[in-house]
Design a protein with these regions (language model features):
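Interfacial non-cytosolic loop connecting adjacent transmembrane helices
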Residues: 33-44, 85-122
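Membrane-interface helix-boundary motifs at transmembrane edges
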Residues: 2-8, 35-38, 60-72, 145
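Hydrophobic alpha-helical membrane-insertion segments
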Residues: 72-91
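Alpha-helical transmembrane segments
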Residues: 21-25, 51-55, 83-87, 124-135
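Canonical alpha-helical transmembrane segments
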Residues: 45-75
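Transmembrane helix-loop junctions and nearby membrane-interface residues
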Residues: 26-34, 57, 61, 87-95, ...
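Alpha-helical membrane-associated segments of multi-pass integral membrane proteins
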Residues: 10-18, 104-142
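N-terminal signal-anchor transmembrane alpha-helix
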Residues: 1-55
């Protein structure tokens, strides 16, 4: 049991989980006609991706990984966790913006925050995730060839 716990809480396992869940989420968003995974059911995969990303970031710090590998693993972890956070905050600020249409300054500020978190969720996090995944894979492949 202790061996299984060490394997599940390793950077390699969590990185593979982030990679697999990223592919699943990307395919589900690219092809939305997947039956029962339409609508709110995709949140299951988004939550799993966010938790595995946060776990990857935590384990990267705990294992005291350094150098370029640390940068790429943290980029993967934070970007996969930040995606769900950006989506939720974008929708929350949109809802608050519709409630405060009469208050011009507050409405404009909430619309600014809505757009900011939309750009974070749709542009910044996927780019960071892609950079982290590809960079980690390249470093691990180079490390495997040296050994």
């Amino acid at each position: 049991m202790e061996k299984l716990k060490k394997y599940v809480l390793s950077t390699r396992f969590l990185f593979i989980a982030v990679l697999a869940l990223s592919v699943v989420v990307f395919l589900l968003m690219l092809f939305p006609d997947t039956g029962s995974l339409l609508g709110p059911n995709i949140f299951i995969f988004w939550i799993l991706l966010a938790f595995s990303g946060m776990g990857l970031a935590i384990i990267t710090y705990k294992e005291r990984i350094s150098g370029k590998l640390k940068f790429f693993l943290l980029s993967s972890g934070f970007s996969s966790g930040g995606f769900l956070l950006g989506v939720v905050l974008h929708n929350a600020f949109y809802a608050l913006g519709t409630l405060t249409e009469d208050l011009a300054i507050l409405h404009a500020f909430l619309n600014f925050l809505e757009g900011t978190f939309f750009l974070i969720a749709v542009i910044a996090c996927p780019i960071g995730l892609l950079v982290g995944l590809v960079g980690t894979l390249i470093l691990w492949i180079k490390d495997g060839k040296r050994a």
